[in-house]
């Protein structure tokens, strides 16, 4: 929903410490707009068959150059994972693993957090983990900003810490989605 995306974009901006624009809308809204209801199906279809194209579009929308800032081999490996993975466990793990790999490895430089968050949402919609894209995991991550940063820094040695935090974020995000639906 549009409300879910706006909440996510605002929380992402706060998580990254990004300044709000003069109109109060964070620059991250452009990246999140790739999942707006009018274009969501098209973005997710493209993500399923050409994920690097969608990652590039997210980065460009966030003000980046549209290519990984480092370790393009990891980006290629993630693309293969997205296009070849299947099964219930894969459906649950993909959004979390994708987010962790992009954010912890800073694949898109300063835009890595927003690219990771938007890509994780696209993955969750694609796999059916969050088929309508209503969950707002960003709010939880913003509330647990210090733990998130610590888990990102320790990802190489203890990836389970970040995975657990991200699963908790998705659980809390689903609860927030229920609240949005009830208020509508």
Regions found by a protein language model. Name each.
Residues 1-184:
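FIC/Doc superfamily catalytic core
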């Amino acid at each position: 929903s549009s409300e879910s995306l706006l909440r996510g974009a605002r929380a992402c901006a706060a998580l990254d410490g990004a300044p709000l624009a003069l109109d109060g809308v964070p620059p991250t809204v452009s990246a999140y707009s790739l999942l707006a209801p009018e274009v969501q199906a098209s973005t997710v279809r493209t993500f399923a068959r050409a994920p690097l194209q969608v990652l590039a579009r997210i980065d460009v929308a966030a003000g980046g150059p549209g290519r990984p800032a480092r370790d393009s081999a990891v980006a290629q490996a993630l693309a293969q994972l997205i296009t070849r993975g299947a099964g219930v466990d894969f459906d649950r793990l993909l959004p979390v693993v994708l987010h962790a790999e992009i954010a912890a490895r800073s694949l898109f430089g300063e835009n890595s957090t927003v690219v990771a968050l938007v890509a994780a949402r696209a993955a969750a919609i694609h796999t059916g983990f969050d088929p309508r894209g209503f969950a707002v995991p960003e709010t939880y991550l913003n509330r647990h900003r210090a733990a998130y940063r610590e888990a990102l820094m320790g990802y190489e040695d203890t990836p389970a810490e970040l995975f657990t935090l991200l699963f908790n974020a998705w659980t809390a995000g689903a609860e927030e989605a229920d609240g949005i639906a009830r208020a509508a």
